[in-house]
Amino acid sequence: MEYQFTHSIHGVVAKCSMDHEAFARWLNAEITENPSQLAPIFAEIEKCRAAFPNHYECVFEGREYSLYFDYDEVMAKANNLDAAFDDEEMEEGFQFYNEESIAFCGLDDFEKFLKAYQHFVQTYH
């Protein structure tokens, strides 16, 4: 997973590589206004590691995006993704685009992403 942090007039903005955009959107929507929310997420990462190889799941539900943890993977998913969507309403040849609404990565990669964000905020903000 590749990522980049920048400053804007709204504060720190995260961007992620394709297939991981939902993690940046989650961070920008749920964490940038309240970085103290990272502490319970780091604690959850440790619980996931401690549970390995047993099955373990946890959900952090946010306003716009939620995180789903298991013992080795994290999923960021837009809360509105499960909204009813009628394929019949779409014109022929079109399909629903949800690449920015859901993403998966390993637990270690997610932890590195969050630590890099923390470092950027502490160093440059």
Curated annotation (Swiss-Prot):
InterPro entries assigned to the protein according to its UniProt record, in alphabetical order: UPF0231
One Pfam family per UniProt: UPF0231
Family: Belongs to the UPF0231 family.
Protein's recorded name: UPF0231 protein in hemN 3'region
The organism of origin for this protein: Mannheimia haemolytica
Superkingdom as given in the UniProt entry: Bacteria
Coiled-coil regions, chain positions: none
